[in-house]
Amino acid sequence: EEELAHPARKYAPPHGRLYLVCVGSTPVGCIALKALDDTRCEMKRLYVRPEYRGQGIARALVHQLMQEARVAGYRQMVLDTFPFLPEAITLYKREGFYEIERYNDNPMPGSVYLCCEL
């Protein structure tokens, strides 16, 4: 809850990023980047409202975040997701992510851990 109440604490530049996509004045999607160390970052909070899915918004957000991570000097991006989000896992794998061992303390059983070389 702290993370959502104060997102700038975790996702503010220079080490993080937070993007919000709006259609008109309506927020429809978001994505964030969090530094793990000098060379590795984590993709966080990818979300697109259901009524806006299938329009390439998630893919555009992922591309933007990966480009920003490269510019910031990160060489590797990791993320965790859930097995009940197969569309997200397919998107990540299409963008070059591959499965890795657990890298964090995510308490959700069955989480899927992915990595991409930037």
Language model features by range: what are they?
Residues 1-44, 49-50, 62-64, 68, ...:
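Acetyl-CoA-dependent GNAT
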Residues 3-6, 73-79:
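A broad, low-specificity signal for short, low-complexity segments enriched in glycine/proline
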Residues 26, 40-41, 45, 49-63, ...:
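Conserved glycine-rich acetyl-CoA-binding loop
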Residues 75-78, 82-95, 99-118:
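C-terminal "cap" of GNAT-fold acetyltransferases
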